[in-house]
Amino acid sequence: MSELTTIARPYAKAVFDFAVEQSEKDKSAVEKWTNMLEFLSELIRHDKVQSYLTSTSSTFKLADTVILICGEQLDQYGQNLVRLMAENKRLAVLPAVFNEFKSYVEEYKSLSQVEVVSAQQLNDVQQQKIITAMEKRLARKVILNCRIDSSLIAGAIIRTNDFVIDGSCRGQINRLANELRL
């Protein structure tokens, strides 16, 4: 586990718990927090903002500047989060907070991100078969993220948090090579 994740997790958990609590009154609260954190994460990743974070020593000035840039993207609670994280000199951790927050939301909504790396573009039927199989195996709704890696030669690699299924030709060749070395 990286240091950023260790620092980000308590912030993400607190924001998530607050968003769930808010969702009793406002059904879109979790979605609003997702949007706010995503916006903050993208803002903090920007090169000019990164250099500003390291050059500014006043936490109040830093927080006020970030809040000013965000404008209507942040509600009062989002602004409070920015102030708190600026005070603790943790604004640079916001992208990791967003990633951790997304993990909590996925767990809450019984979602799993599944990455499929294939040698060629998968058509809709192939993608649907993978989604169906993974939903059955994981017993939860699946969000498929596909990308192409021609070095696989053929087949695909399917990854989720818990496991990897390597059905690629490259993987089979590597396993065969390892067996032959014995």
Swiss-Prot record:
Organism whose genome encodes this protein: Histophilus somni (strain 2336)
Keyword check for Transport: yes
Similarity annotation: Belongs to the ATPase delta chain family.
Protein name as annotated: ATP synthase subunit delta
Database matches in Gene3D superfamilies: N-terminal domain of the delta subunit of the F1F0-ATP synthase (1.10.520.20)
A GO cellular component annotation in the UniProt record: proton-transporting ATP synthase complex
Pfam families in alphabetical order: OSCP
Self-association and partners: F-type ATPases have 2 components, F(1) - the catalytic core - and F(0) - the membrane proton channel. F(1) has five subunits: alpha(3), beta(3), gamma(1), delta(1), epsilon(1). F(0) has three main subunits: a(1), b(2) and c(10-14). The alpha and beta chains form an alternating ring which encloses part of the gamma chain. F(1) is attached to F(0) by a central stalk formed by the gamma and epsilon chains, while a peripheral stalk is formed by the delta and b chains.
UniProtKB keywords: ATP synthesis, Cell inner membrane, Cell membrane, CF(1), Hydrogen ion transport, Ion transport, Membrane, Transport
